[in-house]
Design a protein with these regions (language model features):
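Acidic, mature catalytic/reactive cores of soluble proteins
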Residues: 2-483
């Protein structure tokens, strides 16, 4: 969300027009959200309390509810409203301020960031409590654009030192592994909690087991038929009708509190907290690790662009390659549990990689590798800037690059020592080491074109994107970003 909001700020700050048209319904929703943020902007000066949080969320929820119900009942009217682009930019900037305040509030003492929180709504309050640390939260904050390079480094270092890291695969779990409570250790009410409740003591004394019972070993347990707090409330309602009305009225809230202390249903997160495979306990979810890889690379790129301290840049590079070293293609089949170059969904704590092909990891890997070799598109022009490419990746001896061209024909390009080859839009790109950057384009008609600098013009780039077959090879002489 933050990243897209920043993109919108940049986009609408640069456009040449000064107003846009939106549907009347979207306009009213925008007004509702913007007025809520504007009226509560003062809350950003400190910590937002539970009462103010409820007020803000109620107003935001009402704006959304009115928009949704209006569309459901009447569909879009077709009416249009005009919004000044300057006002849109102000709205996006204000929403960014609230997002940034939220991110800052979720920083943990250990330098990591909370990912998912629990929300408890009261009559006039909304209370926030935190769950355990999660890899997804660190990826989110690293990808958001919120952190300065030195702050990104702090997160990456803290993550490596956290319980999320597993030396077994030199990689990162979705969340720290833990032992589940044994079945016989569940549904145990502490004696001190029983002593707090006159109702529970009265029921135990009377031998009434509809809500609570005392075992032969002296332990206290809720009735086994109660599967959630709603069923516990129904049991208390029945007790009201059977002579316990005064005690139920007195202790109902306390019983609900004790029930949650025993079962912690509010913290139930599905398979992540109750299974040992897939995205469960002790599992590495490889798509999230590759998202972490890409996020680390983007923060390295930002540090370079900002002209950050070389030591900081070097440490960010170390963090990136440390994450990269834990990904499958760097491993032996024995360690990975499968062919290392094949994409797999996850690796449970008790076995090798599982679910071949079931992953979005490939997408992040492709993006990260293109960034590694320095290929990007700037204003329509293919540009080569290998800011994190290591000199050690260039060949130490002659080899060849096999590929399929735009016509589907298999081709081979010879590579000499000191070169590196890959394809882009099915066109072979051959890097050679040099102090100054230059490009040579090979055309299908046998001609060549030399270019000073690191960019191919937009028209030629479009021919490459469209796979016209006009350009058959790209030679780039350059200096890699790292040794």
């Amino acid at each position: 969300t933050r990243r897209f909001q920043q993109y919108l700020v940049d986009l609408f700050s640069a456009v040449e027009f000064d107003q846009v048209e939106v549907s009347a319904e979207i306009y009213e929703l925008l007004i509702g959200i913007n007025s809520t943020f504007t009226d509560n902007k003062h809350l950003l000066n400190g910590k937002i309390n539970d009462v103010d949080r409820k007020k803000v969320l109620d107003r935001l929820g009402l704006a959304g509810e009115q928009f949704r119900s209006g569309i459901y009942k009447h569909a879009f009217s077709g009416d249009r409203a005009t919004v000044r682009t300057a006002d849109l930019v102000k709205f996006f900037q204000l929403s960014l301020a609230f997002i940034d305040h939220t991110i800052a509030a979720n920083r943990r003492e250990d330098g990591l960031y909370h990912a998912y929180n629990l929300m408890t709504a009261g009559e006039d309050t909304i209370e926030i409590t935190h769950l355990y640390e999660m890899l997804e939260g660190q990826v989110a904050v690293l990808s958001s654009g919120y952190l300065k390079p030195e702050e990104a480094l702090d997160v990456l270092v803290a993550l490596r030192q956290s319980a999320i890291y597993t030396a077994r695969q030199n990689s990162y779990l979705l969340y720290p592994d833990r032992e589940l409570t044994r079945f016989i250790d569940k549904n145990i009410i502490r004696e001190a909690d029983v002593e707090r409740s006159a109702l529970l003591k009265a029921l135990v004394s009377a031998g009434d087991r509809s809500l609570v019972e005392k075992s032969s070993e002296g332990g206290y347990h809720f009735n086994g038929s109660l599967n959630n707090v709603v069923s516990a409330k129904k049991a208390m309602q029945s007790l009201k009708e059977n002579g316990y009305a005064e005690l139920v009225d007195q202790d109902e809230s306390l019983i609900e509190e004790i029930f949650e202390l025993v079962f912690t249903h509010r913290q139930f997160t599905g398979r992540s907290g109750g299974m040992y495979a897939y995205e469960g306990l002790g599992s590495i979810y490889w798509h999230m690790v590759s998202k972490l890889l890409l996020a680390a690379l983007e923060n390295f790129q930002k540090a370079v662009a900002d002209g950050s301290d070389p030591v900081l840049i070097g440490r960010l590079a170390d963090c990136y390659f440390d994450i990269r070293a834990g990904i499958g293609f760097n491993k032996t089949p024995d360690n990975y549990g499968a062919f290392p170059t094949d994409p797999y969904s996850h690796t449970p704590g008790f076995a090798g990689a599982k679910q071949p092909g079931m992953t979005g990891q490939v997408k992040e890997e492709v993006i990260a590798r293109l960034l590694e070799v320095g290929v990007s598109v700037v204003k329509g022009s293919i540009t080569f800037n290998p800011f994190i490419l290591r000199k050690s990746e260039f060949l130490s001896q002659a080899d060849s690059l096999g590929y399929f061209d735009v016509n589907g024909d298999q081709q081979i390009v010879a590579l000499a020592a000191g070169q590196l080859g890959f394809t882009y839009c099915q066109v072979p790109v051959v890097y050679s080491l040099a102090e100054e950057t230059s490009i040579v384009l090979h055309y299908a008609d046998g001609t060549r074109k030399s270019i000073d600098g690191n960019s191919i013009d937009a028209d030629t780039s479009m021919q490459i994107f469209d796979k016209k077959g006009v350009v058959t090879q790209i030679e780039v002489a350059l200096k890699p970003g790292l040794e």
